[in-house]
Protein backbone atom coordinates (compact mmCIF):
# COMPACT_ATOMS: atom_id res chain seq x y z
CA UNK A 1 0.00 0.00 0.00
CA UNK A 2 2.82 2.41 0.87
CA UNK A 3 4.73 1.74 -2.34
CA UNK A 4 1.57 2.14 -4.42
CA UNK A 5 0.83 5.43 -2.66
CA UNK A 6 4.33 6.72 -3.32
CA UNK A 7 4.10 5.75 -6.98
CA UNK A 8 0.68 7.36 -7.40
CA UNK A 9 1.74 10.64 -5.82
CA UNK A 10 4.99 10.75 -7.77
CA UNK A 11 3.10 10.24 -11.02
CA UNK A 12 0.65 13.00 -10.08
CA UNK A 13 2.91 15.59 -8.47
CA UNK A 14 6.52 15.17 -9.63
CA UNK A 15 7.82 18.24 -11.44
CA UNK A 16 11.15 19.65 -12.52
CA UNK A 17 14.10 17.50 -11.49
CA UNK A 18 11.80 15.11 -9.63
CA UNK A 19 9.84 14.50 -12.82
CA UNK A 20 13.03 13.89 -14.77
CA UNK A 21 14.25 11.45 -12.13
CA UNK A 22 10.90 9.67 -12.18
CA UNK A 23 10.87 9.39 -15.96
CA UNK A 24 14.49 8.27 -16.29
CA UNK A 25 15.16 6.30 -13.10
CA UNK A 26 11.69 5.72 -11.63
CA UNK A 27 12.89 7.57 -8.52
CA UNK A 28 10.03 8.45 -6.19
CA UNK A 29 9.64 11.91 -4.73
CA UNK A 30 10.29 12.13 -0.97
CA UNK A 31 7.28 11.31 1.16
CA UNK A 32 7.09 14.69 2.87
CA UNK A 33 7.25 16.49 -0.48
CA UNK A 34 4.44 14.29 -1.78
CA UNK A 35 2.30 14.97 1.29
CA UNK A 36 2.90 18.72 1.03
CA UNK A 37 1.98 18.63 -2.66
CA UNK A 38 -1.33 17.00 -1.82
CA UNK A 39 -2.14 19.49 0.94
CA UNK A 40 -1.36 22.33 -1.46
CA UNK A 41 -3.49 20.78 -4.18
CA UNK A 42 -6.32 20.20 -1.72
CA UNK A 43 -6.20 23.84 -0.60
CA UNK A 44 -6.65 24.94 -4.20
CA UNK A 45 -9.31 22.34 -4.97
CA UNK A 46 -7.05 20.34 -7.29
CA UNK A 47 -6.54 17.15 -5.23
CA UNK A 48 -8.50 13.99 -5.91
CA UNK A 49 -9.77 11.58 -3.29
CA UNK A 50 -7.13 9.02 -4.27
CA UNK A 51 -4.43 11.66 -3.71
CA UNK A 52 -5.72 12.36 -0.21
CA UNK A 53 -5.91 8.66 0.59
CA UNK A 54 -2.37 8.09 -0.66
CA UNK A 55 -1.09 11.04 1.38
CA UNK A 56 -2.77 9.67 4.50
CA UNK A 57 -1.07 6.32 3.92
CA UNK A 58 2.29 8.11 3.74
CA UNK A 59 1.56 10.06 6.93
CA UNK A 60 0.83 6.77 8.70
CA UNK A 61 4.04 5.26 7.31
CA UNK A 62 6.02 8.27 8.51
CA UNK A 63 4.45 8.06 11.95
CA UNK A 64 5.28 4.35 12.19
CA UNK A 65 8.84 5.00 11.06
CA UNK A 66 9.28 7.66 13.74
CA UNK A 67 7.80 5.39 16.40
CA UNK A 68 10.26 2.65 15.44
CA UNK A 69 13.16 5.11 15.60
CA UNK A 70 12.00 6.33 18.99
CA UNK A 71 11.86 2.72 20.20
CA UNK A 72 15.45 2.20 19.06
CA UNK A 73 16.49 5.32 20.98
CA UNK A 74 14.73 4.10 24.12
CA UNK A 75 16.57 0.78 23.77
CA UNK A 76 19.89 2.58 23.31
CA UNK A 77 19.20 4.75 26.36
CA UNK A 78 18.39 1.63 28.38
CA UNK A 79 21.62 -0.03 27.18
CA UNK A 80 23.53 3.04 28.41
CA UNK A 81 21.83 2.73 31.81
CA UNK A 82 19.98 5.99 31.28
CA UNK A 83 17.39 6.14 34.01
CA UNK A 84 13.66 6.53 33.23
CA UNK A 85 13.67 9.74 35.28
CA UNK A 86 16.23 11.27 32.91
CA UNK A 87 14.28 10.16 29.85
CA UNK A 88 11.10 11.62 31.34
CA UNK A 89 12.86 14.93 31.93
CA UNK A 90 14.19 15.10 28.37
CA UNK A 91 10.77 14.27 26.91
CA UNK A 92 8.95 16.60 29.31
CA UNK A 93 6.96 13.68 30.73
CA UNK A 94 5.58 13.95 34.26
CA UNK A 95 7.57 11.06 35.77
CA UNK A 96 9.59 7.89 35.25
CA UNK A 97 6.42 5.80 35.08
CA UNK A 98 5.30 7.84 32.07
CA UNK A 99 8.63 7.18 30.35
CA UNK A 100 8.31 3.45 31.05
CA UNK A 101 4.73 3.50 29.72
CA UNK A 102 5.90 5.26 26.57
CA UNK A 103 8.62 2.67 26.07
CA UNK A 104 6.12 -0.19 26.53
CA UNK A 105 3.75 1.41 24.02
CA UNK A 106 6.58 1.81 21.50
CA UNK A 107 7.63 -1.81 22.02
CA UNK A 108 4.05 -2.94 21.34
CA UNK A 109 3.92 -0.70 18.27
CA UNK A 110 7.13 -2.30 17.00
CA UNK A 111 5.69 -5.77 17.57
CA UNK A 112 2.52 -4.82 15.66
CA UNK A 113 4.67 -3.64 12.75
CA UNK A 114 6.55 -6.92 12.73
CA UNK A 115 9.73 -5.28 13.95
CA UNK A 116 10.90 -4.44 10.44
CA UNK A 117 9.12 -1.54 8.76
CA UNK A 118 10.09 -2.93 5.35
CA UNK A 119 8.96 -0.28 2.96
CA UNK A 120 8.78 2.46 5.57
CA UNK A 121 10.76 5.63 5.03
CA UNK A 122 10.12 9.30 5.48
Please tell me what each predicted stretch does.
Residues 77-79:
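Short amphipathic helical patch at the helix-1/turn junction of helix-turn-helix
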